[in-house]
């Protein structure tokens, strides 16, 4: 019985991919809510990581994010994804105003039939909670978005990976004249996610 319990507490490659993909689902929703990209009334409260989080109820956005997360889960499992970026830009000028960057390191020696890694779910959730809290607190230091904005998701993968249908290749969409704030990281021991946000420095009149 003790052996079975130990296995349940360990982290497998597939389990790690699911944890990280789920983090991105909640993380992206949090960014879209906190930065006002979609109306606040199109979000609903859920409990996750010991926090009250907001997730979209917009059917189109929900479907889009679900598809992204499912694809991401597969790429994480195969250690093919290196970075995810949420780009926020002005609809009027197309200027990039914010760039939320999540760098992903994967231990390629991890195999699904290998022994689970020694890492408790609680320790991982504690680290993820810290990252989500920083996203939530970002409104205290990020400039107000004074124009209607849209978002893009960029996913950096291995170069030889075929681009799935409905996806397209994109440039990095950097910000001119920007500041960067590094956020916390978390690790499952198989995947490590480091995060930062870059934002355009407002011009002074």
PLM regions and their residue ranges:
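Long protein-protein interaction modules used by eukaryotic assembly/scaffold proteins
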Residues: 1-63, 71-205
């Amino acid at each position: 019985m003790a052996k079975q319990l130990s296995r349940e507490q360990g982290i497998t490659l597939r389990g790690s991919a699911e944890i990280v993909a789920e983090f991105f689902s909640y993380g992206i929703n949090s960014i879209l809510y906190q930065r006002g990209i979609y109306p606040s009334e199109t979000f609903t409260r859920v409990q996750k990581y010991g926090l009250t989080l907001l997730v979209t109820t917009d059917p189109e956005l929900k479907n889009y994010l679900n598809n992204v997360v499912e694809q991401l889960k597969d790429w994480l499992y195969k250690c093919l994804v290196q970075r995810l970026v949420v780009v926020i830009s002005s609809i009027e000028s197309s200027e990039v105003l914010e760039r939320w960057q999540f760098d992903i390191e994967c231990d390629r020696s991890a195999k699904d039939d290998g022994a689970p890694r020694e890492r408790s779910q609680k320790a991982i959730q504690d680290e993820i909670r810290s990252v989500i809290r920083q996203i939530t607190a970002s409104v205290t230091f990020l400039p107000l978005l004074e124009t209607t904005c849209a978002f893009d998701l960029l996913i950096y993968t291995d170069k030889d990976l075929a681009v799935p249908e409905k996806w397209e290749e994109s440039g990095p969409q950097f910000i001119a004249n920007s500041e960067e704030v590094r956020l916390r990281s978390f690790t499952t021991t198989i995947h490590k996610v480091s995060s930062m946000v870059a934002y355009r420095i407002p011009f002074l009149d």
